[in-house]
């Protein structure tokens, strides 16, 4: 049985991701590496299965549950993480697949560690918390645009292993996978999937293998892009982008007004030097401009003003 759980994105997540996706909207095309399209497609069980099948190198992989935007709570019941895409296969393995385009904003290695622990929380809270043997295997995958390890591989797989004894594995059931769209070194079908995600069209010359799973994935992407639900998503992205633009414009207008008021107050005591004028007009911090405005109101001269704000 497949469960498609669609949870509305929190406003701050939409604001962060919509600004990135707005560029794609203006260009008229989304790729599978774009947050909104990735979520919309991964809701589909077949698409989710095909992506995981290629990543894991398991052509016969079968899923029994599929979720997108699932919120995982910590032990105290507080929200901890929101998983982009999560699935469970028929053997009980848990998969979390994250599209992570902006790797410079966070430490992906430590994020994977944090996610790993929290994914076990629902199992431990189910009443069998003292029986750790019930913890299912978990596979966390981060799909990135850049190579965070710098070794030019399309796929990096990490499991716990003893440093003193070669080939002695901890076998704690945890696996962390990092996929890198910038490399062509890896299994041809996986490289083709990553290149398809990066530039989502079968005409992409970087697609080395027209695997049936990629072909099927492309059909689903086409269906999603033609759906009413996707049109609603596009409109939401546009709306949030416009709201953010209006907010930025309003803030910019207020800042310009404050800067002009500061200059007018200073000019009451004499001409303002070009250096000071430029400093005031170039300032974009609203709080700092408010402080300067108060200082200008109390200052008897430009020099007095500068001494108050320095």
Each predicted region: which residue ranges?
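Pocket-edge structural micro-motifs
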Residues: 142-145, 180-181, 225
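Upstream accessory/linker segments immediately N-terminal to the RecA-like ATPase cores of bacterial MutS
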Residues: 164, 171-187, 192-203
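Short, charged alpha-helical interaction segments and adjacent helix-coil junctions
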Residues: 2-32, 36, 55, 88-90, ...
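Accessory alpha/beta interaction modules
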Residues: 2-175, 185, 248, 303-306, ...
